[in-house]
Each structure stands twice: as C-alpha cells, then as structure tokens.
Design a protein with these regions (language model features):
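Alpha-helical transmembrane segments and their immediate juxtamembrane cytosolic regions
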Residues: 1-361
Length: 361
C-alpha cells in the first residue's frame, strides 16, 4: 500500500480503541461496571484490557508509516522522534499534575505526582521503537521483540513477578525508582500498571505493530499482505493463549502472554478492517469511529481533562445520581453516563474531522 495514503481502517480501529478507553475510564459510578467494561482485577482478561495494548500496537504501525517519508534515515528523523517522544511524556506529566491538583486543591504540591501513565508509556515506547527503526535492520525487529519478552518473563519467573504482593520484582523496581508516592494509587496495588519493568514488554508491543506496518506497506499485493497479517495474528493469538498456562494473562503486569494475545487480536482485527474499508471501500458504517481515530491523542487527552473537571465540579455525581440512576439503575445508568460522555467527546472529533484538522502530537 501507498504510505502517503491515509489508511481509513487504521483511523477506524484507533477510533474504536479510543472510544473504548473513554467508556472504560468514565463510568457513572465506580464498582457498577458491566464485566466487559471492567479491567481484570489481577490475572485474567476482559475486553476492557484490550483497548490500550491495541492502541500501542497501532502506534507501531503508524510509526512505520510516518518514518517511511524519511526513508528510515537517522539524521533527518531523529529530531522529530525525540521531540515527539518528549512531548508525549510532558503531556502525560501535565495531565497527572492537573488531575492530582484538582483533587487536592494544591497546585504546587508535587509530592504525590504520578510519574508514569498512559501518555508517558506511549512516549517512551514510541521513542525507543522509532530510534531502533532508524538504527537497526528491520528484519531484527521481531526477534528483538521476542527477546525482550523472554527477558521480562525471566525477571518475573525468578522475582515472584506474577503475584500481587510486596515482594513482586515488578513492584520492587517501581517503588525503588519511582517511589511509592509517585506510583499509581501511591503504590497501594504494589505495582504501577505503566511502571518501569513492564515498559519492556510494552516496547515489544509497539515493535510487533511496527513489523505488521511493514507488511501492510511493503507488500503491494492485497492477497499477500492480508494472508501474512492473518498468519501473524493467528500465530500470536495462539502463542499468547498457550503461554498463559505458564505466564498468566495480566494487564497490570503487561505479561508476555498478554502482549502476544493482544497483538494477535489487534492484527486480525486490522486485517479484517483493511479488507472491508480500504480494499472493498465499504466506509459508510464506520464514520462514527473515524471521528475518534483521526485525532486519537487529542480526543484522549481532552476526555481525561474533561472527565476530571466533571468530577471536580460534582457534575458527574449530579447527573448519575439525579438522572441516570433513577432512570436506568446502577449498572445500566453507569454505562449510559459513559455513553453520553463518549458522545460529548465525539463532537470534538467530528468537528476536527469535518474541517480536515489532524493534530499530530
């Protein structure tokens, strides 16, 4: 496929993941979530666990496409890579500061600022993957991604890395480097879901996406790249499932089995959408998600800030308690709050899309 042509299927699948993240993160009342929209508490897997890793996989594909225009030359691309990586990390830190500040009312107290988070993980993993893309042969990407997963698995295997306890190596490293006060929920869950060690397999996630991006762009024959993507997706899916017997599926730890399984699902989903949307040109049913996927990071950042303000101003509680809960009950009312908030964010995405405004972070 032409790397200069915008892949609508990529926008749509990104949009599905961003919409999923907004729904999962913005329910009417904590604890009243349908199972599909609640993360697994520790080991296990739910649809809610898929949205963030799928977004990271798609970021790997976008990284390949964006670096094509530099012909993967280090000198012209490196400034852009470093700038984008640092910008994502900075935005993540500002978001964490803002959410902490409006909760505490103290805008100058950084003692409990969470240092890692979704945007920080995106920035770090993008930066590492993109720098590797302009410095090493791409044929080494998949072997290197597997090696990183093996290294992380060894850490977990010999460091009590599968248990939800204080002596889990993943949590020990997070606490030692970040400090408990700067971890998710001040370290009360022992590990940070976007912590230090678990960034290793997260890099693998983006690298596998990069490899799939290479397949989509470099192979010109539609049947061939679809077959390759299907085979890779199926292999990763079954590998993740089989590995889960020795290495449990765990989003909070970003376990190797979790990486393989979610990459497999993402590859198969993208192959299907590429065929339906970009090959067969069946686009009309997907415009809703395109509005979220054309400017995914802008919509995500906006949703986090808007969601935090609605909670701080007590609008969130008022809408749920006085309107949605009496009409729909606890669970469905909580879900409907997320749906209305999703549509609210979709308005921004729709306006940007209609005006052909694409904000790249």
């Amino acid at each position: 496929m032409n790397p200069n042509k915008r892949l609508l299927s990529l926008d749509v699948l990104r949009g599905i993941t961003v919409a999923g993240m907004i729904l999962v993160n913005n329910t009417g009342k904590c604890g009243y979530n349908f199972a599909a929209f609640a993360h697994a508490k520790w080991d296990g897997f739910s649809p809610a666990d898929l949205v963030f890793p799928m977004f990271m996989f798609l970021m790997g594909i976008s990284t390949y496409i964006s670096l094509c225009k530099y012909n993967f030359q280090c000198r012209p691309a490196i400034a852009k890579i470093i700038k984008r990586s640092l910008l994502l990390i900075f935005i993540g830190l500002v978001m964490e500061w803002f959410i902490t500040a409006i909760d505490s009312g103290n805008y100058f107290d950084l003692s409990q600022l969470r240092l890692m988070g979704v945007m920080q993980r995106l920035g770090i993993c993008y930066g590492i993957t993109a720098l590797l893309a302009v410095t090493i042969p791409h044929k080494r990407f998949m072997p290197l991604a597997i090696i990183l997963l093996i290294v992380y698995f060894i850490f977990q295997l010999f460091g009590n890395g599968f248990e939800k306890s204080a002596d889990n190596i993943v949590g020990i490293v997070d606490s030692a480097i970040l400090g408990s006060n700067h971890m998710y929920l001040q370290g009360r869950q022992f590990v940070d879901p976007e912590g230090i060690l678990s960034t290793i397999p997260a890099v693998s996630q983006v690298m596998i996406g990069f490899v799939c991006g290479k397949i989509i762009i470099d192979i010109k024959d539609n049947d061939r790249w679809m077959l390759n993507l299907f085979l890779i997706g199926t292999t990763l899916l079954f590998a993740g499932y089989l590995l889960s017997y020795a290495c449990p599926l765990n989003k909070r730890l970003w376990s190797p089995s979790f990486v393989l399984l979610t990459c497999g699902i993402a590859a198969l989903s993208l192959a299907l959408l590429l065929y339906i949307i970009d090959v067969k040109q069946n686009k009309k049913w997907f415009s809703f998600f395109e509005a979220f996927g054309a400017n995914p990071l802008v919509i995500y950042v906006f949703s986090c800030i808007a969601g935090g303000l609605l909670v701080h101003w007590h609008i969130h509680t008022a809408v749920f308690s006085n309107l949605l809960n009496p009409l729909f009950g606890n669970y469905f009312g909580s879900f409907m709050y997320g749906v209305f908030f999703l549509l609210f964010n979709g308005l921004l995405g729709y306006v940007l899309l209609k005006r052909k405004i694409y904000i790249k972070l």
